[in-house]
């Protein structure tokens, strides 16, 4: 049994615990029947529900872009392919740079990869779980949640996170290379050359974004917001056209991928958008309760990590929450100390969703890549913390020290 299978077994263990809690909550709660252990698992049933309810949000984000992937590849290919080939990189890296793996990046990467499976997975699941989500999701969502006064800390954190994405990608690529990733029994050939050469365009984009966040942070952040709105519009067009094609047979946009199984598809080998979403939700039934219960059971060690980083308890809790979903973390930012705000935003760039949506997506689409993706995301997140600690404004150092002393 490999590490990817072990991770799946662990999540299913937590899924069963959460299912028991949901059942017992109908009859007075888990504590009533299971005593001390029951009390320790109470609330996991609610996370069980959250995991399944995520299906709707996932569908809105994924279905339209998944259907549009071959169309976008056809339109963008003549421009993207020559540029990336000139840099010595596979064109699929474009997809993971701008799109999250679960917002079309994985499927667009496949269309642009030209048959190079390793490059497709490197972009679609490793890069597409770090840089893409930051640009199309995390920054726009954060701006709608955080206080305006915290935007400077968001910019500093994202800057720290962006520059360490290549480190996370290389780490994930090396794990994939040495773990012997296979698809349908066939080995996927990750090489040093592929891992390093495909980082060239990513490094260029990372440096440009970092410079923009350093010198024109407000304009850069507003630019991300505009891009995200454009993307939502594009996804909506794709979703509407795909539904019309499925229900009425009208092909409003030629070349759309089916969103349900089509004639010729082999069950178990080909999964269309709607089935992928269902598979992800099944994984989230265990992933969300797992994060809740691990946070509860290991609260003291996690708080000690916060003390080690010299941040308050809210900031430490935010980092743990980020591993499942960064939205709660952004909601907690106003209660964090300055250092905690920058560190949390930096950590979230790569590490967000590592034990949530991205884990579910990898498990549903390519479970051989679960471990490489998680390792890459965590290494990217941890190294981002190191950079963020150097970027905390010096004029806030006294405030950080005072806030830390107030907790002790």
Curated annotation (Swiss-Prot):
Q: Which reaction does it catalyse?
A: ethanolamine(in) = ethanolamine(out)
Membrane-spanning regions, if any?
A: 1-21, 61-81, 89-109, 126-146, 155-175, 192-212, 230-250, 274-294, 313-333, 342-362, 369-389
GO MF terms, alphabetically ordered: ethanolamine transmembrane transporter activity
Listed under GO cellular component are: plasma membrane
* Induction of synthesis: Part of the 17-gene eut operon transcribed from a single promoter, induced by ethanolamine and adenosylcobalamin (AdoCbl, vitamin B12).
Q: List the disulfide bonds.
A: none
Which cellular compartments is it found in? Answer: Cell inner membrane
Q: In which pathway does it act?
A: Amine and polyamine degradation; ethanolamine degradation
UniProt membrane topology term: Multi-pass membrane protein
Superkingdom in the source lineage: Bacteria
- Print the keywords alphabetically: Cell inner membrane, Cell membrane, Membrane, Transmembrane, Transmembrane helix, Transport, Virulence
According to the record, what happens upon gene knockout? Unable to grow with ethanolamine (EA) as sole carbon source. Slightly attenuated in a mouse model of infection. A double eutG-eutH deletion is not impaired for aerobic growth on EA supplemented with cobalamin (vitamin B12). Cells are unable to grow on EA at low pH. A non-polar deletion mutant does not grow on EA at pH 5.5 or pH 8.5, poorly at pH 6.0 but wild-type at pH 7.0 and pH 8.0, slight decrease in acetaldehyde release on EA plus vitamin B12. About 25% reduction in survival in mouse macrophage assays. Bacterial growth is not enhanced by exogenous EA in macrophage survival assays.
Q: What is an annotated GO biological process for this record, any one?
A: ethanolamine catabolic process
Which family, according to the similarity comment?
Belongs to the EutH family.
What does the protein in this record do? Probably involved in the diffusion of protonated ethanolamine (EA) into the cell at low pH. At low pH most EA is protonated, and this permease becomes necessary. Contributes to bacterial survival and replication in acidified macrophage vacuoles, but not to bacterial uptake by macrophages.
Cross-referenced NCBIfam families: PRK15086.1-1 (NF011665)
Q: What is this protein called?
A: Probable ethanolamine permease EutH
Lineage, top ranks: Bacteria, Pseudomonadati, Pseudomonadota, Gammaproteobacteria, Enterobacterales
